From Swiss-Prot:
Region feature Disordered, mapped onto this chain: 1-27, 945-1049, 1103-1228
Protein name as it appears in the record: Myosin-1
Modified residues (Phosphoserine): S356
One biological process term in Gene Ontology: endocytosis
Subcellular location: Cytoplasm, Cytoskeleton, Actin patch
GO function terms (MF aspect): actin filament binding; ATP binding; hydrolase activity; microfilament motor activity
Chain's role: Type-I myosin implicated in the organization of the actin cytoskeleton. Required for proper actin cytoskeleton polarization. At the cell cortex, assembles in patch-like structures together with proteins from the actin-polymerizing machinery and promotes actin assembly. Functions as actin nucleation-promoting factor (NPF) for the Arp2/3 complex.
UniProt record similarity statement: Belongs to the TRAFAC class myosin-kinesin ATPase superfamily. Myosin family.
Native organism: Laccaria bicolor (strain S238N-H82 / ATCC MYA-4686) (Bicoloured deceiver)
Signal sequence range: none
Pfam short name (any one): Myosin_head
GO CC annotation terms, alphabetical: actin cortical patch; cell tip; myosin complex; plasma membrane
Polar residues composition-biased segments: 1162-1175
Amino acid sequence: MAPSKKAGKKVTPASKKSAGQGKVAKADWKEGFKKKQVGVSDMTLLTTISNEGVNENLQKRWTNGEIYTYIGAVLISVNPFRGRSVETLQRYRGKNRLEVPPHVFGIAESAYYNMNAYHENQCVIISGESGAGKTEAAKRIMQYIAVVSGGQDSSIQEIKDMVLATNPLLESFGCAKTLRNNNSSRHGKYLEIMFNGVGEPVGAQITNYLLEKGRVVGQIENERNFHIFYQFTKGASDEQRELFGLQGPEAYAYTSLSNCLEVSDIDDVKDYHDTITAMGVIGLTPDEQNEIFKMLAIVLWLGNVQFEEMDDGNSSITDTGVTDFVGYLMEADSALVQKVLTSRVIETSKGGRRGSVYDVPLNPAQATSGRDALAKAIYNNLFEWIVSRINVSMKTRSAHAQIIGILDIFGFEIFEDNSFEQLCINYVNEKLQQIFIELTLKTEQEEYVREQIKWTPIKYFNNKIVCDLIEERRPPGIFAALNDACATAHADPAAADNSFVQRTAMLSSNAHFEARGSQFLVRHYAGDVMYNVAGMTDKNKDSLIKDLLDLVGSSGNTFLQTLFPDRPDPNSKKRPPTAGDRIKARALVDNLMKAQPSYIRTIKPNQNRSSSEYDVKAILHQIKYLGLNENIRVRRAGFAYRNTFEKMVERFYLLSSHTSYAGEYTWTGDSKSGCEQILKDTGIAKDEWQMGVTKAFIKNPETLFALETMRDKYWHNMAARIQRAFRNYMRYKHECARRIQRFWKNNKEGIAYAQTRDYGHQILAGRKERRRFSLLSYRRFMGDYLDLNGKSSLGEELAGACNIGGESVTFSSRIHLLVSKLGRSSKPSPRFIVVTEKAVHILILSVRDGQTQYNLERRIPLSTIKSIGMSNLRDDWLAKEGDPLISCYFKTELVSNLVKLTRSTVNVVIGPTIEYSKKKDKMAQIKFIKDETVAKDDLYKSHTVHVASGEPPNSVSRPPAKRKPGVVRPITQGKLLKAGGPSDKPKPRSVPKPKPVAQPLPGRDSTTVAPKPAIKPSVTPSSTVGQRPPPAPPRNIAPPPPPAKPETPMYRAKFAFEGQEGEMSLKKDDVVELVEKDDNGWWLVKMDGVEGWAPNNYLELVPPKAVSAPPPPPRSRPAPTTTPKISLTSVVADASSKPVSVFPGMQPSNGSATPWKKPLTADTTPASSRPSSAIGSKPPPPVAAKPKPPVIPVKPSVSAKGPAKPPIPTAPRPPAASTSRSSKPATAVGQVDLAAAVSLFVTHSRELLLMM
């Protein structure tokens, strides 16, 4: 039934024309069922602005598959590391960014729309570190523009095809596999697409920036050369192999020395055919393609030219057959090739006249350098030629009106050894950051001025001072100093480097520069980078020697000569351009400043290319140096939200009775007055919003949230009736979900603990016997046992002694260090060990002037630890290469932490002996032998450790204990389902038949077995066992006097001590009883019935007091008349019997309990174990073991692809921890079967639907 019209309210017919009425459609009730938003899609609406808040919001969205987020008009993209559907492309066509979720298509649509609407050039700047998804974002933008730009003309479609074909072609020649990215762009490119007046592409142009040509001749371990070399050597035809003498990539030095020929997600043969296809689309002729591959063959064979040193120190070619083939490919004389590669012609001049000519032979190192220089020059010039040839094919067919530029450039780089390449890359990124800051603030300010909005200008850091430091000519910057050094000492690279070092000293007045000898530091926006001067001037010159240019000039191959068109004039006094001059950053900046920018900031979620791992720490660092927090603050400095009057009214007209009725738009005035009416009717304060010329501005995000909440409630109220009809179903659904969640929560932690525990098994790799308590099912790895990361006094003192600053402590514990003293044998001495992210700290406790203090005895950087030695027995000793030999209860956990922190570079050596450096240049050896007489831990004496046999090396952790089954409540219990559904009566539980237990009769020996009582199966067994016991002996007899207590030494605490688990916390002047002394400085004491360990230097002896007379015995009472109950495990004692304690796991034998004859020792019960007593008198508490707090493991990340390929080992080492299926631990007992739970939920859901 349709709702009736409100009295006195007249609805304007749709046919009548009114201001803005015809453009607003009736509100749709389906909006109330839209998918709930995860986080906020525009981070200018964050309630709390901080780097952590930005990180948390990005993590929420990325975890739920939302990889895109806005900061105003800036798009943040977090690489998902998985393929995504492109079916959403049409959703963004003709829509503004507020109408659809954030996406790279939204940025492309905005740029294309603004170009057509405002007739302004646009550019999209994509930035981020390597592997963050810059190239993929650029592909999506080109794909979107090709689809939406229209045009049916064949020439327009040809331009679109060529623009898309540039991607596989330039990726093959300009991308390579690195440690961080399998398809890393090793060059920067700026693609400009030209459009005519109606928005159709009529041409394009690509500008190349700084190809990493050094990769051609060398790569680090597990990286590859450019893709095209592997595609060519694997996918070439038989004709090409015959023509170029081509073999596999393993046959060439330039492609095989890095030991990475295959990549899991790259098909080189398929990519080779795609490259050939792209060449055809671009318009490269077969002859041009043949010449390109011939140049690649020349580069590959040049790498195989090897040199050997002769007796006079000069070089000679090892295999002249290789140079003969190089001469054949270059169409040059092979003898000239050999001569140019092994010697150099030097010409002297005097007074401007030509002097003598000398033929100087080269040593092998110089010859190798010349060979590599020629190979790099050929490939670099070939890449430049390909880019130029693409531009020729894509040149404009007609006059163009506007341009859309797409910048895909290398990200900021910081390595251990940074040289000239990193300086150039970081300089370009510094310039882009400057553009980002200036244009963002400029656009913001212009909008406020244009809309006549009052606001306060924002102060920000201008990194122009860093750009001037690098590029300025007067006063000279870094590039100018490099050019001057190359000009003054051009003949000697070492002298040129020294000249550059002297010139950089003049730059020290800049606060962002710091000279440090042969290195210098630049404080970039993304962090401080230390650059190495060695080789910088030589790389900056970037020119071939005259001999190599003459070799190219003598070639009969015209294509090869075309690659080297510019040859320096020897008589010219003009300095040739250097590599720094060729960066062309100024030209790039000029092009970008002429266009209206759109920004895409890409973020890399992890270094493992995993689609499920979100590295919070790494992403937080990227958020900081990308300046996302500052960008949000700039956007929110004036007003957090703005929109046109028309869009504002269309969004919120439901909130005012003056603008809507029953979902119909009824406002007859203009849009601006409609906005004001809505804001007034919703009670928004006047200082929270302003009206501009064309837009409404809202100051705080909370105001916008309030408007959105009121709008959502409108539809919620309308949907309340529908919700009632589904109430029973929703309750049932939620109950199923809660049960599944409850089951999962109860078991997921156990899985994480098992995975962390198994990591230690993988490191030991079945090479070491294990202690029994190391194989507990849920032994937790806490790590920081001394609480350095907490607020305990001990942790604070140790942290202060270590001076760790802001470093995070991953492991800390008490240990014993083997200390050698003069004239005496070595002896274990108590110490403290603290492991941080950077180093291992060993501390000692000492007493001075009656005060205890902790002193740092040694600090070992993690980078210096090469190996760890352990025995193959169950002892706790281990030795790190570089002196210390320690004994640690948590040895497996310590080794696991060191392996993780060093990324598996530490070698774990396990054997019957440990060899360590006792003193400088003096090695010592410690032996480990089995000795079953050692009852507790191990015994060290004279470089020999005696230890009892442990669990077998291949032992695995014990399965978790089974839980006691509880009462299962049916899911249909209560009002979840209506009558007629599944029965809610629980099934009757069967009563197990009790087992008869022998009962000792009173007055007889405890070993006598009583007859079995007759017990009915249906009756619960009674403790009386059917017989009436004799009455208890009379209790009115006075007890005998207690025996005299032995004199126990008592000690008083001199200082307060805050103990951990297993330790006794003491206050000053507390009196404790001494139970056991240990020679390691810790005593076992007892106070108020509780035992624990305390340091002996905190205690002082209390003089014994006089023993007082015992108190009189209590009055006797008559014995009770009731019969005492006898349980199945209790013992009826006579007058001479003593109470017996029954511990868990101990069962009575022959009807009687075995007395506990000796106290429980530390080698049979862990410190955390607290056995409870069964029926009978309470025994004295067992002796507490030395402190061993439980460990809380860090949850291991789950990798879908298994562990990464480890580096080639130099010595035996344990396999890296893996969470792949092959190494997944067995399912714990009691683990929830989620598949069964979900199946049960689906079954009940079907039953419910059938009932309804």
